[in-house]
């Protein structure tokens, strides 16, 4: 009997070279693991450094803003004091005594005499009376002032005098 030759099945086995040993696979893994750990550690150190720089920068920004706020508060306080002083100055300048003194000394105005004061009703039927002072027609209303300044005062006084003259004559005739 003749037998057919058998086919041998061959499964190739990994060839182990003399350079690699079974342990070297583990050491490569350890090296890769250690390299990863070093990279991770370096990344964490860099991240900590960046976070530290960021915190320093933000702290400096907060300090700068704080100094600006303090400066603005001081400026506000100064401006409020100046405002109060200016309000006191305005009140002093508006005082009736000062206005009367300036009117008589600098502007040359005089107090009206009793016979120069006439009471005229403000509006018909209102019942209120307005005090109006006039001057004699021969004298100007304002003396001692510059001609350009007194022109409108003189014109006003003359117009008032002409307007009140009929009422004055009617009051004298009654």
Swiss-Prot record:
HAMAP family: FtsL. The keyword Cell membrane applies. The gene is ftsL. It comes from Moorella thermoacetica (strain ATCC 39073 / JCM 9320). Keywords: Cell cycle, Cell division, Cell membrane, Membrane, Transmembrane, Transmembrane helix. Residues 60-174 are extracellular. It holds the Pfam family DivIC. Disulfide bonds: none annotated. The chain crosses the membrane at residues 39-59. Its main location: membrane. Residues 1-38 are cytoplasmic. GO terms for biological process: FtsZ-dependent cytokinesis. GO terms for cellular component: cell division site; plasma membrane. It is a single-pass type II membrane protein. It is found in: Cell membrane. Belongs to the FtsL family. Essential cell division protein. This is Cell division protein FtsL.
